[in-house]
Amino acid sequence: MKEIIRNLVRLDVRSDVDENSKKTQELVEKLPHEVLELYKNVGGEIYITDKRLTQHEELSDSSHKDMFIVSSEGKSFPLREHFVFAKGGKEPSLIIHAEDYASHLSSVEVYYELGKAIIRDTFPLNQKELGNPKFINAINEVNQQKEGKGVNAKADEDGRDLLFGKELKKNLEHGQLVDLDLISGNLSEFQHVFAKSFALYYEPHYKEALKSYAPALFNYMLELDQMRFKEISDDVKEKNKNVLDFKWYTRKAESWGVQTFKNWKENLTISEKDIITGYTGSKYDPINEYLRKYDGEIIPNIGGDLDKKSKKALEKIENQIKNLDAALQKSKITENLIVYRRVSELQFGKKYEDYNLRQNGIINEEKVMELESNFKGQTFIQHNYMSTSLVQDPHQSYSNDRYPILLEITIPEGVHGAYIADMSEYPGQYEMLINRGYTFKYDKFSIVKPTREEDKGKEYLKVNLSIYLGNLNREK
């Protein structure tokens, strides 16, 4: 536990408030180490500060200055007057004001914000847990609780009053069944239920209230605490042994990319550096157009019939390709890695206006079955360079909101490619550039329902690809 705390918690306090920082840290230390490991695994950081929250570096930008947040009790507060906040997104962090936390109500708020961070920002809980039948069944039991027996039984609202937010109580009638579609359409409301249950379970003075008024959600949290948090954490560790996958988390991805490819970058020539930067700007289009047109080959004297100006432009592109090849041949990816790429229906030779895979946020299942039937197990040679990202949907220009298909690509150790974001004109895309000439195989097609706010309520088609190993050692 000490090592996890040391790697996860950052102290930003003066020496005269050190006692309060210790008491604040003790709140965190009471949680299962598996919970903290899951948060750390996605690049999450916990800051304990004696500053006003909006003065902390994580929250000092203008978007947080006048923000209002909602407490576990549904009350709205200006962020600048509150004492804890879980910042979500691709670089999650929890900022806690250093206090003695003698008030149990304050402790509940700290655990509530951490519970939000766990269910909203932490993989795989943020993708799967709200759709877990155990969670759904527990919600339904609480929503169907009754006082008394038989015909005289009446609705027991205690569990709903304790855990459901105002909007959920208004939209979900007592006794109404909850299903995955309802959860997908009301993500923040059900994240609140999880976070509130989490907070009451781990704050000792409120644990009994959760058990008395919402026994099904108490038992759900009990199972998570005693068994499933550990199982989930162990599963993540095991998968990370086999393949590196940063999901949406940019802080960890950027750190790995910069450190792993630092020596490679230092050994590039000026011409190689220039073309990498140029490729991330306007040069990628003519380069890849040339490679697609000639199936990845540089054809001698191909511009023989062109005028002098056109011939010179063609030779320039060919030299750029040679420099880019030389740069990427110097680099090999050091471990099995998952990268991401958003595409349109054109990936499968379909035009949007003719095919329209997604309508009103819903993926057409029949068209997915058609694509799977035609392409699963098939291979294709990527004659041009492939731009991918270390993280899913790093920028709104390439996101689920615009492109209905996500390629999740497994890159085996030894493939020629490099992290080029710190050399790019668009560093926020966290680009991994994969060398040309590899053969890719379509492995799996699956429809993903929206489980995160970033999905904009839209389903998308996830297509798993891998590099065909028989082609791994192909040299240019």
Curated annotation (Swiss-Prot):
The active site is at R341, S387, Y398, E431. NAD(+) binds at residues 280-292, 341-344, 382-384, 398, 431. Pfam families: ADPrib_exo_Tox, ATLF. The keyword Glycosyltransferase applies. It is found in: Secreted. Its main location: secreted. It is an enzyme of class 2 (transferase). GO terms for biological process: symbiont-mediated killing of host cell. A probable mono(ADP-ribosyl)transferase; it is not known which residue is targeted for ADP-ribosylation. Upon expression in yeast cells causes cell death. This is Putative ADP-ribosyltransferase Certhrax.
